[in-house]
């Protein structure tokens, strides 16, 4: 096999090599059954065992309390932008949203189709380079829920704290930072996460929802989008994305083998610190984000001269450092360093950046 590259893609993102090798070994013949997971009935004993283990492993990793349901759904996080409102926002009701970047804004725009949305705080006041402190927020006393995105993959902002919302359920889009470190699930009413960053391949979204929030869907909510229907049917109201579910389960197994989220969190802290420390010490590279609000998962950086962007990317590709181009809306570069990216990838990137700076700085 040719040497695998270091993949810094924001999503679909790198998967652990051990998971890919396991999937490869089981592709044609899962556990001696003579068929692939892709060919199994989702209601077979074999697949039900896969699904059950995946859920239990995720519960173990995040210490999910028993009064929360874990759902494996379709449509990605973008579908959740509507699904949340259809389930949790009553007719003539109101919800509070925190704006920290493009993904927050997409959630706000979609939810606005179904009710009154109060933007309780916005990072726009800081040009999206810092997160407004909670003392600046203007939360509604009668909000059905408070929604925020703990990590903005495009801008590179991340909360290092959990908002206080009292009795109002806190809803979080954790598509890009779930499983990156320990988390107190009990602080949230609901968490959702598209799989293709820290969970598995694209095609599935994980929803962790407190049981008392089920059964609130509006009359116009399609059956397929009703969280209670999904929970009552074990996430199998219709045929689920079985391959993505299976692969996500393999990632959960791998995470447990690595020592769980505590061990992964320590690795991630070292990874992000190594990269940011180099960028901050450099004269060629820069990161504009307020230091306490910097993302552990997505590190945007710019070169002092935009004319160097193309040669930088070409050289990176030649060195097996892939998908470093920043999002088209912000430009520059971005290194997405999710759980599957190890310190060797960070060291290789820093070494290349040093060499490039010596040549072009």
Swiss-Prot record:
Annotated catalysed reactions: O-phospho-L-serine + 2-oxoglutarate = 3-phosphooxypyruvate + L-glutamate; 4-(phosphooxy)-L-threonine + 2-oxoglutarate = (R)-3-hydroxy-2-oxo-4-phosphooxybutanoate + L-glutamate
InterPro entries found in the cross-reference section: Aminotrans_V_dom (IPR000192), Pser_aminoTfrase (IPR022278), PyrdxlP-dep_Trfase (IPR015424), PyrdxlP-dep_Trfase_major (IPR015421), PyrdxlP-dep_Trfase_small (IPR015422)
Compartments it resides in: Cytoplasm
Annotated SUPFAM superfamilies: PLP-dependent transferases (SSF53383)
Enzyme superclass (EC): transferase
GO cellular component: cytoplasm
Positions annotated to bind L-glutamate: 43
Stated family: Belongs to the class-V pyridoxal-phosphate-dependent aminotransferase family. SerC subfamily.
PANTHER family recorded: PHOSPHOSERINE AMINOTRANSFERASE
Subunit structure: Homodimer.
Name of this protein: Phosphoserine aminotransferase
Gene name of the record: serC
């Amino acid at each position: 096999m040719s040497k695998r590259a270091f993949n810094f893609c924001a999503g679909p993102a790198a998967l652990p090599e051990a998971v890919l090798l396991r999937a490869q070994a089981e592709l044609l013949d899962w556990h001696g059954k003579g068929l692939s997971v892709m060919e199994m009935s989702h209601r077979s004993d074999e697949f039900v065992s896969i699904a059950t283990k995946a859920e239990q492993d995720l519960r173990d990793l995040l210490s999910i309390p028993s009064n929360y349901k874990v759902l494996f759904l379709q449509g990605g996080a973008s579908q959740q932008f509507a699904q949340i409102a259809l389930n949790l926002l009553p007719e003539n009701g109101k919800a509070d949203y925190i704006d920290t970047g493009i993904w927050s804004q997409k959630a706000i725009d979609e939810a606005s189709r179904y009710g009154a949305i109060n933007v309780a705080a916005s990072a726009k006041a800081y040009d999206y380079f810092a997160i407004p402190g909670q003392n600046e927020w203007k939360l509604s006393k009668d909000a059905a829920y408070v929604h925020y995105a703990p990590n903005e993959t495009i801008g590179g902002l991340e909360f290092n704290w959990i908002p206080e919302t009292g009795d109002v359920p806190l809803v979080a889009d954790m598509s890009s930072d779930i499983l990156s470190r320990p988390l107190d699930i009990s602080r949230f009413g609901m968490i959702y996460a598209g799989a293709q960053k820290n969970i598995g391949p694209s095609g599935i979204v994980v929803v962790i929802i407190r049981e008392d929030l089920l059964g609130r869907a509006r009359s116009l909510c399609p059956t397929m989008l009703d969280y209670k229907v999904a929970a009552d049917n074990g996430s199998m109201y219709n045929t689920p994305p079985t391959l993505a579910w299976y692969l996500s389960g393999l990632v959960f197994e791998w995470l447990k083998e690595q020592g769980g989220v505590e061990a992964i969190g320590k690795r991630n802290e070292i990874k992000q610190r190594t990269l940011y420390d180099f960028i901050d010490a450099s004269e060629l590279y820069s990161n504009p984000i307020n230091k306490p609000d910097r993302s552990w998962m997505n590190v945007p950086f710019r070169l002092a001269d935009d004319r160097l962007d193309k040669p930088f990317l070409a050289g990176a590709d030649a060195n097996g450092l892939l998908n470093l181009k920043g999002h088209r809306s912000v430009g520059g570069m971005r290194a997405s360093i999710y759980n599957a990216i190890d310190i060797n990838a960070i060291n290789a990137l820093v070494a290349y950046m040093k060499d490039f700076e010596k040549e072009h700085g």
